[in-house]
Amino acid sequence: MKKDIHPNYVEFNATCSCGNVVTTRSTIGKDIHLDVCSACHPFYTGKQKAAETGGRVDKFNKRFAAIGKK
């Protein structure tokens, strides 16, 4: 690698709105603030709400179920 052409790869803190702080390394060189992280995101905490199970396919099947039974 050539010297003095690569950006500095330094440690920085990513602070979430829930208060969780993650230390990682990057070339941005300054601390950042996150809206969500793995400690408070509903997918990772298990508090995720199920999406609507019925959709267009279910509506189609209900509408034409009687025709298919003949």
Curated annotation (Swiss-Prot):
Cofactor binding remark: Binds 1 zinc ion per subunit.
Residue numbers binding Zn(2+): 16, 18, 37, 40
GO MF term (any one): rRNA binding
Keywords: Metal-binding, Ribonucleoprotein, Ribosomal protein, RNA-binding, rRNA-binding, Zinc
Record's subunit section: Part of the 50S ribosomal subunit.
Gene Ontology CC terms, in alphabetical order: ribonucleoprotein complex; ribosome
Co-factor(s): Zn(2+)
Protein name as it appears in the record: Large ribosomal subunit protein bL31
Gene source species: Colwellia psychrerythraea (strain 34H / ATCC BAA-681) (Vibrio psychroerythus)
Protein family per UniProt: Belongs to the bacterial ribosomal protein bL31 family. Type A subfamily.
